[in-house]
Amino acid sequence: LAQAAAKEGLDLSPASFVDGAESALLELVRTGFPLDRLLKTSDLVFHAEGPGVKAEAPALTAFNWLSRAAEAALRRLSGEIFDLSDLNAARLSKALDLRLTGTAPGSLYLGVALAPPTADLIVADDEPVYERLREAIRNLPVATESIGEEEVMPSIREVLPDPAERDATLNALLRLSPTGKQGIHTLDVSSPGLAKGSLSQRERVVLREAVRRPDLANRRQGAFVGEVREADLDK
């Protein structure tokens, strides 16, 4: 390489070439390996970008916002999934064991994984619910593809046919969408083997409107007669 560079009139000594290759390799080890481990061990990986996470050491306020938003969104989503399965949603979502799988340099990467349930938390017959929850968590990036410029597109019904799970997913994405106030302008969300989604203040506006005024397909009017057995005023 040094000889080829000399023919082109470039001053490239073997030592300078080795130094450059070593620097590139060290940068790859510093940034690539931690991220690769995150992608392999996490159910969901967040990548935040913005002025608050540009430095080598991200702002603590930005990190705290991301970790709190992730926990709140996933616990709320888990409560909806448990509720759909007729389980004690309040108890199980509160006891949900969410693990921080690690962080990686390059703006701010943060990985989250759902730990297996313990025997005292859930019986064996209900363990499939956790797999449904893990699937719902990993599908969050896929759902972002249905967020259009001004509205959530009808394709969301193909991704999430169940209306209740669809609403829960949109609420989770709304909670994850950056406000821009903590130095985070965009948040990429990815999961193993699935497409990466992106959330920003624009998606936040669209999601807020979709959650506030859901687009109900096949609307019908009718009168219902029955007895109200239970009402959850917290939802």
Enumerate the predicted regions with their spans:
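Protein-protein interaction interfaces in oligomeric scaffolds
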Residues: 1-201
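Short, flexible coil/linker segments at or flanking structured domains
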Residues: 32-34, 195, 212-216, 226
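A short, compositionally biased
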Residues: 181-183, 231-234
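Short boundary/loop segments of OB/S1/cold-shock single-stranded nucleic-acid-binding domains
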Residues: 201-221
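Structural detector for short beta-strands of small beta-barrel domains
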Residues: 218-233
